């Protein structure tokens, strides 16, 4: 199993839950909830800052497929977010992967209910808990298979921007 801190990311319409792993990739724990930015800049900037603060080697974004495994509008939203995040993290050497997250929020809500937390009072916590479920699932897959979980998110092309910090040369997936 690869070593290094990984981030788990649960992308929602209003909030983004963030989790992290220990450096050995054994256990996922909650970090924070970031408010979703309609312009798509401050939320990405905060996640990049968290990745740098934690010296992350990878970010795992949950891919919300329906129960049959088909894409939904939420799937497209999460994929687009992952591509934009990959464009920001690639220059830092941090890979972004997409992992099936079916029922992660339902699982997180159930765990919080068992812990005596009320759903309406725990919305921000639910997002973090869902990120923990996504990341722990990815860690377990990697531990069982020996391969990186899910699929790589390709960086979104940075068309016409002079911002060299986020310009990315697309390369092959080496994971």
Regions found by a protein language model. Give the residues of each.
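Phosphate- and other anionic-substrate recognition elements at nucleic-acid/protein interfaces
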Residues: 2-7, 13-175
């Amino acid at each position: 199993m690869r070593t290094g801190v990984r981030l788990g990311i649960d992308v929602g319409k209003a909030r983004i839950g963030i989790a992290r792993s220990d450096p050995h990739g054994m256990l996922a724990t909650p970090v924070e909830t970031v408010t979703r930015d309609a312009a798509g800049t401050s939320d990405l900037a905060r996640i990049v800052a968290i990745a740098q603060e934690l010296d992350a080697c990878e970010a795992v974004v949950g891919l919300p497929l329906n129960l049959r495994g088909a894409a939904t509008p939420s799937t497209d939203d999460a994929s687009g977010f992952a591509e934009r995040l990959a464009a920001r993290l690639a220059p830092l050497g941090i890979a972004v992967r997409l992992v099936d997250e079916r029922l992660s929020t339902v699982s997180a809500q159930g765990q919080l209910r068992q812990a005596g937390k009320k759903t309406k009072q725990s919305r921000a916590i639910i997002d973090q808990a869902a990120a923990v479920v996504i990341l722990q699932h990815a860690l377990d897959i990697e531990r069982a298979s020996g391969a990186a979980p899910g699929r790589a998110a390709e960086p979104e092309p940075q068309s016409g921007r002079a911002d060299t910090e986020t310009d990315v040369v697309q390369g092959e997936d080496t994971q």
